[in-house]
Amino acid sequence: GVPCPPFSVAGKQLGADDERDLFPQMLRLVQEINPRIVMIENVRGILSSKFNAYREQVLQTLKKLGYSTHLQLLNASDYGVPQLRPRVIIIGIRRDLADVFMFPEKIPEKTLSVGETLYDLMSANGWKAVEEWRRTANKIAPTLVGGSKKHGGPDLGPTRARKAWAELGVDGRG
């Protein structure tokens, strides 16, 4: 995927006017390399009506380059990942290979909690409180927003996301 901040509702949503917008460079690389399949991932903000023309331009460029295009909003938690992570996925398949593509169907009743998913890892070194943590971490985790050492570590998102992380036994401040 290309950087998400130009389209994120957590940012200024500057789209093409954001210096971090790398869609043009990505499309240039697709033209130069001519891969059989292209997969592009971005935040759901790109589905905003504000970006309709921009999104359509990306899809039309892929079509002009010889790709059939398919776009869908997917959520990782629908496929067994214990995190709320909705992402827009754009698939481009070279038309000389195929014109048909189907996104995977959701995995029913496959939603795992953070505790179920990470239990083995968390208990590997004999952590005595792992059972209590596993019971507490009984939900799907919110999306990590970002962060870096330069900016003080992970950003657990808005206040409600920080609270949700705390309920899972995660302190983003270390």
Label for each model-derived stretch:
Residues 2-171:
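Class I S-adenosyl-L-methionine
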